[in-house]
Amino acid sequence: ILIRGGSQRVVDEAERSIHDALMVTKDVIEKPALVAGGGAPEAQLAYEIREWANKLSGREQLAAQKFAEALESIPLTLAENAGMDTIDTQVELRAKHGEGKIWYGISVMDGGVADIYGKGIFEPVKVKEQVMKSATDAASMILRIDDVIAAGKMKETKPPRPGEEGGVPGEF
């Protein structure tokens, strides 16, 4: 593929875009399956995990809620990058998933929450699997840390008295 452009920056951007498109094509050929894009799967997973977390208690509940938050950050980041209000988007997205509308996500083209599946917005399953695996592995590694090194409170030290080591004779 021959790429030409007015400047090196344009050529570099075109090269990156072509590389990305070729890698997506490769992923679809290797595993010919698609899933809805726009953060819809992450929003649904976040909803399901929150529902499950309500049945838990203690640290397990907190960990599950934080995992749901992390998943939900994907559609919210899409919304923010599209110039949408993230709070309004989060409320609307949660409401749609609460109504059982599992394919609702962020439609950047419409600038709102929409039925992503119905709009034909998809991404390769292979990419989604790798993202989820990497994120889950990172979270699991953090959770496996048994020991926490905490800095103890520093002991209060009194200034040395005159005549003691470090003190200046005659000082009060």
Predicted regions, residues:
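Extended, low-charge hydrophobic alpha-helical regions
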Residues: I1-F172
